[in-house]
Amino acid sequence: MSVRRHIGNPEYLTRRIPQNPRYQHVKSRLDTGNSMTKYIEKLEEIKKNYRYKKDELFKRLKVTTFAQLVIQVASLSDQTLEVTAEEIQRLEDNDSATSEPDAEITAKTNGNGSPGEQSPSPVQFINSEGAGDFSRSTLQSVISGVGELDLDKGLVKKTEPNTKDKPYPDCPFLLLDVRDRDSYQQCHIVGAYSYPIATLSRTMNPYSNDILEYKNAHGKIIILYDDDERLASQAATTMCERGFENLFMLSGGLKVLAQKFPEGLITGSLPASCQQALPPGSARKRSSPKVPPLPAENKWRFTPEDLKKIEYYLEEDQGPADNPSRLSQANASGRDAKVPGTRSGQNLPAGGPASHQNPRSLGSGHLQGKPWK
């Protein structure tokens, strides 16, 4: 019995299609559910952005958890400032109301004596023992609550420093930047203190007063961060070995923080190692003059615009977890686009970044006109 031969070479079925490196960044449009591709991509992302080690002494804090903590602290601090401002205004109104009748009594008594007494002559005033004490507050004026400072209260204005230039009062976390001083001045997270890792090698006073205040304190934590976990992991391990139990490390550092929150949390210009590299072949290289990096501002609190941007990117990061598939998002957006008065303008808050679009706001016309996107 003869062996039946196949038509053609069977090696053609096992031959792999050559891949073009120019289009390796292009992903499949239909990508739903769990797959081996997603699992491999997740492992590659972990190896690329994180440096996990066995038996880590310190705890890790996710970037999204840190953003939620910042929003809560800022909102509570703003409410406390509003209540404090109202109380100060009410106390000032009460003080001004009580000082007016006292000022009238003092004006009638001329600052000394009773209202019925006559003012002494200039000669008697000079020869008297109390010469030169006319402008001073008398016993009666002091008892009634009017003194020298109260009389000059309207002339001298109090110069109080702006509270927005100071850190949040009773902040539950202490944020430490373990990079060198130059990197801190170029770029850092708003509200972070500069604490280079070389400070831990000091023989005397390696910790500041703030660190000693937050060390193992109830309801407070210490957070360390750097660019890519190289320095922060070493500093966190050393501090944990020295007895710090409430120490956390920002997982991923500025590199992951810049990917998930490009605006709002960081002040200054990001270093080149933390910026996202464009995929090959996605855009042509244009010869443009390099702009010098802007230094970081001396900023300790987040503005309302910063908080809106943080909330926007936080919703974008948590959005795919709420919706199981992209196909359902596209269908829902197509139905919304047919209704006059679409709700696409409501997805982006006022003051948020205009360059990032929400996938829910894309209409069906965009999907049909540009199928390659």
From Swiss-Prot:
The modification Phosphothreonine is found at T109. It is found in: Cytoplasm, Cytoskeleton, Microtubule organizing center, Centrosome; Cell projection, Cilium; Cytoplasm, Cytoskeleton, Cilium basal body. The keyword Lipid biosynthesis does not apply. Disulfide bonds: none annotated. Signal peptide: none annotated. The modification Omega-N-methylarginine is found at R343. Its main location: cytoplasm. SMART domains: RHOD. GO terms for cellular component: centriole; centrosome; ciliary basal body; cilium; cytoplasm. It holds the Pfam family Rhodanese. InterPro entries: CEP41, Rhodanese-like_dom, Rhodanese-like_dom_sf. The keyword Protein transport applies. Keywords: Cell projection, Ciliopathy, Cilium, Cilium biogenesis/degradation, Cytoplasm, Cytoskeleton, Methylation, Phosphoprotein, Protein transport, Transport. Residues 107-127 have a biased composition (Polar residues). SUPFAM superfamilies: Rhodanese/Cell cycle control phosphatase (SSF52821). The modification Phosphoserine is found at S96, S99, S114, S121. Residues 89-127, 275-300, 315-373 are annotated as: Disordered. One of its GO terms (biological process) is protein polyglutamylation. Residues 169-266 form the Rhodanese domain. Gene3D superfamilies: Rhodanese-like domain (3.40.250.10). Found in a complex with TTLL6. Required during ciliogenesis for tubulin glutamylation in cilium. Probably acts by participating in the transport of TTLL6, a tubulin polyglutamylase, between the basal body and the cilium. Belongs to the CEP41 family. This is Centrosomal protein of 41 kDa. It comes from Bos taurus.
